[in-house]
Amino acid sequence: MTSNILQIPFRRSHTVSLSDAITQYISTKYDQRPDMFADDLLIIDRLRNEAIHVQEPHVSGISRLVTYAAQLKWLGGKFPVDIGVEFPWYPAFGFNTSRPISQNNIRFELANILFNLVALYSQLAFSVNRTTPDGLKQACNYLCQAAGVLAHLRADILPDLRASPPEDMDDMTLQSLEQLLLAQGQECFWQKAVKDGLKDASIARLAAKVSDFYAEGGDYAVQSNAISPEWIHHMTAKHHHFAAAAQYRQSLDCLEKRKYGEEVARLRDSEVCVNEALKESRWINRTVLGDLQGLKNRVTEDLKRAEKDNDVIYLNPVPPKSELKIIDRACMVAAKAPSQVTDAISMLGDNGPLGQPLFSKLVPYAVHIAASIYSDRRDRLVNETIIGELETMTDKLRDLLSSLNLPGSLQALEKPLGLPPTLVSHAEEMRQQDGLNRLRRSLEDTARVKANDKAAYNEGVELLAAEKAEDDSSRRKYGTDRWAREPSEAAASKLYTTAREIDGYFSSAQSSDNLVEQKLRDSEAVFRVLTGTNRDLEMYVPSSRRAAIPPEVERESIRLRGCLSEVSRLENRRKRRAQALKDKARTDDISKLQGWEAARLEREFPMQAIQASQFEDLFEEQLHLYDTDLEMVTQEQHEQDQISAQVREANRAFTRAHTGDASTKEREKALQELENGYLKYKEIISNIEVGRKFYNDLAKIVGRFRDDCKAFVHQRRMEASQIEGDITSVAAMASLNLSQPHLRQYSQQPTQPAQPVQPAQPVQPPNQLPPQPQPVQHQPPRDEPLTAPQPTRANTRPSMAPGVWSPEMGIRFGAQGTWDPSKGVKFS
C-alpha cells in the first residue's frame, strides 16, 4: 500500500528473562529475599513480553509500551543500568537490520521501547482514514506525539545511556525522523485546510512550513548513516513539492488581489520547484509522483493563462524572484510527548493509570550504605565527641587527685587502722572479675584476632608478590614489546595502596599493644594485692597510731571530704548520662526517614540511581538531636573546672593544717598506690576493649583485601595465559613464513634427469610448488579506487616425470578392474 507519508518501522527483540537478573542482583546486593517480590518478578517479564510483541498499528499497543517504559524508568532508580541481562534488539534502519545489537543496559531497553512507541504512533497515523477532516486531525495528533516521544528519547534518555547508541539512534538520524514526523503532521493540517476551503494565503503559509520541515529532515538524513536513500529522495521531493504548492497558493492570492505581475512570478517559481521535485521521480512512490504530476499540470495551465492575460490585458511588470516577498510561515504542529512518557513516574501508584510501581518495597542499595554511614557518623559523635570527651575530663580529674595524693592522705587520717570501705569495695570488685586473669585472657583473645588478621593480610600480600614475580618473569622472557600489558603495581594500584595502609594500621596498633602490655607489667604487683584476700590488703597497708585530731585539721578534712564526695557524684552522674546517651543512640532509627527520602528522590529523579551522598541533608538534620548533649559536655567542663579549683584549695588548706608522722605517710602512700592500681585496672580494661574492637573491624578490611587480591590474581593469570597463547600462535606463524623462502629456493633448483623407474618401488615426485605469494605491503589510502587484482593461471601444464600420477589422469584399474591388496601397488 503506497501513501504520501512514511511510517517508521518497529524494532524487534527476542524474549529474555529480566526477572532472573533481578533475582540474582537482589540475592547478592540486598538484605531482602527475592521471594518477597515473586509477583513483581512475574509481572516485569509479562510486561516485557507484551511490549516487544507490539508489532502492529493498534491503539492497544500504546498502553503496553508506556506501562513497560514507566516501570523501566522506575527500575532505573532501584537497580544499576547494567543489571546483568543482555537485551537484544534489531535495528529499524541501516544495513544491519538482520543482526541484533545486545547491551546489558536498562536504558538501552528503555530507548528501544520508546522508539517502538514512536513507530507505533507513526503507523497509526499511516493507517487512519486521511480522506476526512477527523482522520486528518487524528493523524496529525499521532505524528506530533511521535515527534514528542522522539524528542524525549533524544534529549532525556540517550544522554544517560552510558554507551554508544546504535547506528539508527544517533543524533542525526533521530533529528531527521523528528523533522519528518513534524513535516507529515503539518502536511495533514495543510490537507485539512485545503478540504475546509481556507483562504489561499493561509494555505500558502501552511505549505511553506511543510516545505521547511521536509528540508530540515532531508539535511539531517544526508548526515545519517542509517536513513536509506529512498527516504532522502522522498523528503527532497516533498520539500520541492510544498515549496511549489506554497507559491501556487500565493499566486492565487495575488490573482484575487489583482497583482498580476507577481502572480506570474510566483507561478514561474512554482513551476521551477515542481520540476526540481520531479527529478526525484525515479525513487519516489506512485502516490507522491501522482500528486506532483497533478500540481505540475495545474501550475502549467495557470501559468499559461496568467502570462497571456498579463501580456495582453494587464501589462504589469513581472518582478524577479529576488524581489518577491518571502511567504510567512504558519506552524501548526509541535513535538508533544504524552504525559504518560514524560511524567511516567508520577503516574505509578496505588490508583495510578500505569499501575503500581514494581519492587517498591525494595530498599535501594545506596540506602543501606547511607544508613551505615549515618550509624558510623552518629556513633563517632556519641562515643568520641561526647562520651569520649566526658571520659577524658574524668581521667584528668583522677590525675589531679592522684597528683594530690588523694584520697589516700585523707583515708590515712580518717581511718588509721584497718582498711577504708572504698578500698575494700574496689578489691571485692576485682576479685569477682578475676581481675589479673581476666586481663591476661583478654590480651590472649585480642592476640588471636590479631594473628588471624595478620594471616589474611599476609595471604593477600603473598598473592600479589607471586603475581608480580610471574609477570616480571614473563616480561623478561618475552620482552616488553610482546608482553605489553601494565605492570602489576600499575594494574592493581589500589590494592597496593590498601596493602600499605593496612601495614600502617598494624604498625600503629602494635605500638598501642606494647603500651597496654607495659601498663600491665608495671601494675601487676598491685593487681595481685587487690585480687588477694583482705589479709593481704591489711599486710600491704601499714597501720598508723591513733591520735587525737586537732579541730582545724578536722575542719579542713571535712571540707576536703566534701570536695571528694562532689567528685564522686560528678563521676556517677557522667556514667548515667553516658549510658542514657548510648540508649538514645541505640533507639535512633533513621530507616523510616530514609525510606521517605528515597521515595522522594525516586519520584523527582527517575532513571537516576540513588547515591548515599543525597542523604547528607537528612543526616545533618537528624544529628541535631544531639545538640543538647554537646551543650552538656560544655557545661560539664565548666563544672569540672570549678570542682578542680575547690579540690586544690581544700587540699592546700588540709596539707597546711595536717603534718602526720612517718607511719601516717607510709599508710597514705600504700592507700594511694592501691587506689591508683584500681584506676589503672579500669584503664587497661578499656584499652583492651578498644583494641579488640579495632582488630574485629580490621578483620573485615583484610578479608575484603584478600578476596580482592584473589580475584585480581585470577584475572591476571587468565590474561597472561591468553597473551602467552597469542605469542605462541604468532611465533608459529612467523616460523612458517620463514620456512617459505627455503621452499621457493628448493623448488627453483634444476630438476635432475629422471631415473628409470623400478617396478613396485615408491617414486618420489619432484617438487612442483608454485612460487609463494609475497606478503602484502600496507600502502596508505589513495584518493582513486584501487583496481582489484586478477588471478593468473599458467597457459601450459608443466610436464610430469614418467611414472608420476597427476589428478588429471583419473584413477584407472587394469585387467578386470579389481584390485588385489596382496599384490601391492604397481605403476605401468
Curated annotation (Swiss-Prot):
**Can you say what this protein is called?**
pH-response regulator protein palA/RIM20
Pfam families, per the entry: ALIX_LYPXL_bnd, BRO1
- What superkingdom does the record give? Eukaryota
Q: Subunit composition?
A: Interacts with pacC by binding to its two YPX[LI] motifs.
**Compositionally biased, Low complexity: which spans?**
748-761
Q: Does the keyword Coiled coil apply?
A: yes
Please name the Gene3D superfamilies in this protein's record. Answer: alix/aip1 in complex with the ypdl late domain, alix/aip1 like domains
- Protein family according to the UniProt entry: Belongs to the palA/RIM20 family.
Supply the PROSITE patterns for this chain: BRO1
Q: InterPro entries of this UniProt entry?
A: ALIX_V_dom (IPR025304), BRO1_dom (IPR004328), BRO1_sf (IPR038499)
Compositionally biased residues, Polar residues: 789-798
Q: What does this protein do?
A: Required for the proteolytic cleavage of the transcription factor pacC in response to alkaline ambient pH. May act as a scaffold protein that recruits the calpain-like protease palB via vps32 to its substrate pacC.
Residues in domain BRO1?
4-397
Segments traversing the membrane: none
Output the Gene Ontology cellular-component terms. endosome
Specify where the region named Disordered lies, as residue ranges.
743-828
UniProtKB keywords: Coiled coil
**Is Coiled coil among the key words of this record?**
yes
Q: Where is the composition biased (Pro residues)?
A: 762-774
